[in-house]
């Protein structure tokens, strides 16, 4: 028989652990969304600053920004 059920092997019950009890409050707000834009503008500013940082790093890597007194091999 291809499908066989062994008595007591089902994982239908959940186990309570101390780590789970500590993390449960973090998951209690699941599915709730704050009204309005929230922190979206702050995230946009952070993304823009990160893009500027990456472009500066890229320009330094490509030597398109000349750094006085630093020799690049």
From Swiss-Prot:
Membrane spanning stretches: 41-61
MF (Gene Ontology): phosphate ion binding
GO CC terms of this entry: chloroplast thylakoid membrane; photosystem II
Major localization listed first in the record, in broad terms: plastid
Single Gene Ontology BP annotation: protein stabilization
Modified residues (Phosphothreonine): 3, 5
Biased composition (Low complexity): 8-20
Membrane topology: Single-pass membrane protein
InterPro entries per the UniProt record, alphabetical: PSII_PsbH, PSII_PsbH_sf
Disulfide bond positions: none
Subcellular location(s) per record: Plastid, Chloroplast thylakoid membrane
Keyword Transport: no
Keywords: Chloroplast, Membrane, Phosphoprotein, Photosynthesis, Photosystem II, Plastid, Thylakoid, Transmembrane, Transmembrane helix
Record PTM text: Phosphorylation is a light-dependent reaction catalyzed by a membrane-bound kinase; phosphorylation occurs on Thr residue(s) in the N-terminus of the protein.
SUPFAM superfamilies referenced in this protein's UniProt entry, alphabetically: Photosystem II 10 kDa phosphoprotein PsbH (SSF161025)
Region (Disordered): 1-20
Primary role: One of the components of the core complex of photosystem II (PSII), required for its stability and/or assembly. PSII is a light-driven water:plastoquinone oxidoreductase that uses light energy to abstract electrons from H(2)O, generating O(2) and a proton gradient subsequently used for ATP formation. It consists of a core antenna complex that captures photons, and an electron transfer chain that converts photonic excitation into a charge separation.
Family, similarity comment: Belongs to the PsbH family.
Summary of subunit composition and partner proteins: PSII is composed of 1 copy each of membrane proteins PsbA, PsbB, PsbC, PsbD, PsbE, PsbF, PsbH, PsbI, PsbJ, PsbK, PsbL, PsbM, PsbT, PsbX, PsbY, PsbZ, Psb30/Ycf12, at least 3 peripheral proteins of the oxygen-evolving complex and a large number of cofactors. It forms dimeric complexes.
The protein, known as: Photosystem II reaction center protein H
Top-level taxonomy: Eukaryota, Viridiplantae, Streptophyta, Embryophyta, Tracheophyta
């Amino acid at each position: 028989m291809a499908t066989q059920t062994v008595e007591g092997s089902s994982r239908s019950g959940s186990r309570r652990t101390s780590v789970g009890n500590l993390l449960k409050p973090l998951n209690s707000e699941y599915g709730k969304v704050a009204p309005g834009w929230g922190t979206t503008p702050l995230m946009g500013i952070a993304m823009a600053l990160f893009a500027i940082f990456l472009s500066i790093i890229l320009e330094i890597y490509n030597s398109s920004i000349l750094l006085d007194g630093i020799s690049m091999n």
